[in-house]
């Protein structure tokens, strides 16, 4: 049997004024990824699946984010905000192209899963014409109740319109919906705005489907999965739920998190086998950590690639563009940026390595910095394999340190150093015999007695 195709419409036109943010609501991040990106990543994305995103007229950045995450996304603009059904019909052109299953979701529900989208479609294959996603609310106050009789959805009753018996229902409307594509436009066009706000409500689709003599049904998911994000407090709650998911998934894959609740991961973090993450580590977007690597406490990583059995920290900061080879070591109070550090190289302490390539097994002494910025442009430092950079050295880029070369401690290197050479740049040390005693004696003669 040929697989059914689908169109998912994600509504992302809301203003999000309660977020008190200059960002459109759906661009606020959870686990290093925008709310919208989480939803788009979970939505069906096979060869027979299409995606449409409805945005507000002043939110081009939302459309840009949608295209970044899903290049196949079609962007539609809701010129006026006149309700959820009106928002869906902003994508009328996409609906008119036809689909077996029409899915409707919201861009501010980052915890929804691909599995839930798949389950939402199943009743459409078994005779239902409309499926609503529901959840059992710990406190249903304010939610629309899902009225079910004989296993079929008969109504979505808003709090103000619910009877005393209906108010006892804890099964609530999550807003996410699937409609048989053959009737979708007909149903949506029948939704009116004869209500106090004069808006077109998607929930009215249930009554229209039943009036057509068709079946509406419900599937359930957890309350956490359908949390809508409208405030910064709710954003923090979603972050907590997402971090728990990510930590559990990492440990299930063989990662050792010594104190899981203190480790923060990004949605796209990838791990090899036998990775160890010590307490109080923050991993931002774009990080991959290979087999056997250890990330020590109080380290921060973003857009970095960590090789097998490499070590990072404690108190290290790996900024975007950092790549550690197998067995490389980044120690305490080291910062790297746009740095390729090859296998076995060591940068053990108190060092800044930026816009640099460090060859295999090179050793970078404490206090070394690559002086990569001249106030206008960034410049690169090349350090050859097996090179030894003495402590407290400044390497003024652009500069190359040859394979096996040595740089004496305290040097300021401004010229290339040949392979196997020693480069030393410092003033000649002098010692003045008796100077310290003469200095102390002079100070003692001129010092006033302290008052008691």
Curated annotation (Swiss-Prot):
Reaction catalyzed: alpha-D-glucosamine 1-phosphate + acetyl-CoA = N-acetyl-alpha-D-glucosamine 1-phosphate + CoA + H(+); N-acetyl-alpha-D-glucosamine 1-phosphate + UTP + H(+) = UDP-N-acetyl-alpha-D-glucosamine + diphosphate
Gene3D superfamilies hit by this protein: Hexapeptide repeat proteins, Spore Coat Polysaccharide Biosynthesis Protein SpsA, Chain A
Pathway listed: Nucleotide-sugar biosynthesis; UDP-N-acetyl-alpha-D-glucosamine biosynthesis; N-acetyl-alpha-D-glucosamine 1-phosphate from alpha-D-glucosamine 6-phosphate (route II): step 2/2; Nucleotide-sugar biosynthesis; UDP-N-acetyl-alpha-D-glucosamine biosynthesis; UDP-N-acetyl-alpha-D-glucosamine from N-acetyl-alpha-D-glucosamine 1-phosphate: step 1/1; Bacterial outer membrane biogenesis; LPS lipid A biosynthesis
Compartment(s) where it occurs, according to its Swiss-Prot or TrEMBL record: Cytoplasm
Region named N-acetyltransferase: 254-452
Co-factor requirement: Mg(2+)
Binding-site positions, acetyl-CoA: 366, 372-373, 391, 409, 426
Binding partners and assembly: Homotrimer.
Name used for this protein in its record: Bifunctional protein GlmU
Organism from which the protein derives: Rhodopseudomonas palustris (strain TIE-1)
